[in-house]
Amino acid sequence: MTNSIRIGTRKSPLALIHTNLVIQQIKQFFPDINCEIVPIITSGDLIQNKPLYDIGGKALFLKEIEQALLDKKIDLAVHSLKDVPGRIPEPLVIAAVLEREDPRDVFVCLKYKSIEELPQNAVIGSSAVRRKAFIQKIRPDLKVTVFRGNVDSRIKKLMTGEVDATILAYTGLKRLEVFNPEYCHLIEYSQMLPCIGQGVIAVEIRKDDNAMLEICNQINHLPTFELIKPERAFLEYLDANCRTPIAAYSQYLDANPRHLSKLAYREVFEGNTEALATAAYKSNRTDASTGLTYKLPLEVEFGKMYNIQTNFMLGNLDGSKITFHTETTNIKTSTEAGIKAAKMMLEAICK
């Protein structure tokens, strides 16, 4: 086992909070490992005056960090999963996630409590085409203007009257301790589905780095890991970018996800040495369709299979047409459910 880890991350206050949360998890299992934070400025951080869909999409928040991973300048990278494209460079893999926080969006406005209450032709600051599509579905009269920057800068722009309102992720507001119920109002899932992976902190490594894989297997939150599979499969199949209004949110239907633990994935190896070797080989592999590495449930010990319901949204490029779909599946077939939804909805949106 390694004695130290170089952890790559963006330099934003929220990214550093995420990184320290990952370090806390690592220290729980490996208290003697030294964790060095390596802040990296990404292209997405440098270019703030243009919408992401004009400059390369959310991958711009990962490009330099992933290159540092490939160049072995860092051992592990921390991302907001919502910024991770569906397709990851082949030598890399999302090997762990932390427990998902509340992924809902928040309507931030000094005078009004909801999108519906805004006056005619009010201005909402948002660069996300997903949010723009939902806003225009609810209130087609509203003007949605490009609104980039970190959480603090966006709130300052709101306070100075640059826009009438904005929409931000609850998780970021909470972790930065700037959620104020006086002007921050949660938006329910029924009104606005969250971004794929929103509320999830992801850990990316080189897939051949066994030391990092061992660490990731320990810190990985399996209930969240299972939930994001249909969301990520949906994203990967559509090869969606920042020009495509797309959303998905998964939740367990019949069980408390905290009950899904590593014990449920305990593997029992019996038989001759060849069988043992085969079982050991199968216990760690990459699911190519989602870019996730995980331990296969060779023996599931809980009494019933966990069921997952995922709500999907897909719009056309200009946001004038939006379609919704819901899939219910168990954890063994959740990836296939995401692909199935993508195929059906793509056909519907193209009609």
Curated annotation (Swiss-Prot):
Monomer. The porphobilinogen subunits are added to the dipyrromethane group. Binds 1 dipyrromethane group covalently. It is an enzyme of class 2 (transferase). CDD domains: PBP2_PBGD_2 (cd13647). GO terms for biological process: protoporphyrinogen IX biosynthetic process. Its EC number is 2.5.1.61. The modification S-(dipyrrolylmethanemethyl)cysteine is found at residue 242. The keyword Transferase applies. The keyword Ligase does not apply. Belongs to the HMBS family. SUPFAM superfamilies: Periplasmic binding protein-like II (SSF53850), Porphobilinogen deaminase (hydroxymethylbilane synthase), C-terminal domain (SSF54782). It holds the Pfam family Porphobil_deam. It comes from the Bacteria. InterPro entries: HemC (IPR000860), Porphobilin_deaminase_cofac_BS (IPR022419), Porphobilin_deaminase_N (IPR022417), Porphobilinogen_deaminase_C (IPR022418), Porphobilinogen_deaminase_C_sf (IPR036803), RPE1 (IPR005728). It comes from Rickettsia peacockii (strain Rustic). GO terms for cellular component: cytoplasm. This is Porphobilinogen deaminase. Keywords: Porphyrin biosynthesis, Transferase. It catalyses: 4 porphobilinogen + H2O = hydroxymethylbilane + 4 NH4(+).
